[in-house]
Amino acid sequence: MKRFFLFALWLVAFAFAEDMASAPWAKGEKLSYRLSWGFITAGSADMLTLPLGDGKIEFVSVARNNGAFNSIYPVADTIRTISVGERFLPESFKKILNEGSYHSTSKIFFDREGKKAVLSDTVFENSKRKEIKRRVDTTVTIQGYEHCIISAFYRVRSMDLTGKKDTYFSAVSGKKRYSLQVVIHGKETVETDLGKFDCIKVEPMLGDDGAFKASGRLFIWLTDDARRLPVLMTVKIPIGSIRGELVQFRQGTVN
């Protein structure tokens, strides 16, 4: 279940020329979410933006479950990516999944000059990560402006979404280069524990035919202001849906 929400957090990719360096989150940010399945609080997730200097930023996303869910099916997932330049195109991407008995590490290294992305996916026998169950290495041809799925999440927040039409982009994830469509559904008012927010509702869709085949429909509500805070996300799963609600945020220097 947590993997569906993480996929939601990471599933957007853009190559627009808006200046991300001036975005409020570029100087540091921490977003904390409560993950719910129906009326049940299933876990939490944090997304951090950490400036590294020399025009580089590290994006970190961590998700975990809690309570009874953790005793039945423990989840502890982490994603890190380092991006560089005004567009913050990713240099590297690393995803570590620990979900029940499933343990894997995925890496992507972007070679912009060589127009390729080198991907490595490793599944381990157990949580100690010493015995390899299987490993697949893949090289994907890129055009030079592709994002990984986490840096792309911040790309959409830097865009001027007012009045824009549906747009198509591409990103590298898993073992291939994907085509993505972003549908802008318009403005809505969203009420959370943090208050009421005027938002722009967007829907990323995966696949050449515009169908979100991987995990059902995903909706993201971004505040209609310069912060573009993702205050609410929902994604359909085979049984019900997962809701990610922003419960705390901080912009500026974070630890």
How should each PLM-predicted stretch be described?
Residues 4-13:
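Sec-dependent N-terminal signal peptides
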Residues 10, 143-150, 184, 243:
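Low-complexity, intrinsically disordered regions enriched in charged/polar residues
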Residues 17-18, 76, 120, 136, ...:
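Intrinsic disorder/low-complexity signal
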Residues 18-114, 155-255:
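Acidic, serine/threonine-rich low-complexity disordered tracts
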Residues 108-154:
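Hydrophobic, well-structured mid-protein blocks that either form specific transmembrane helices
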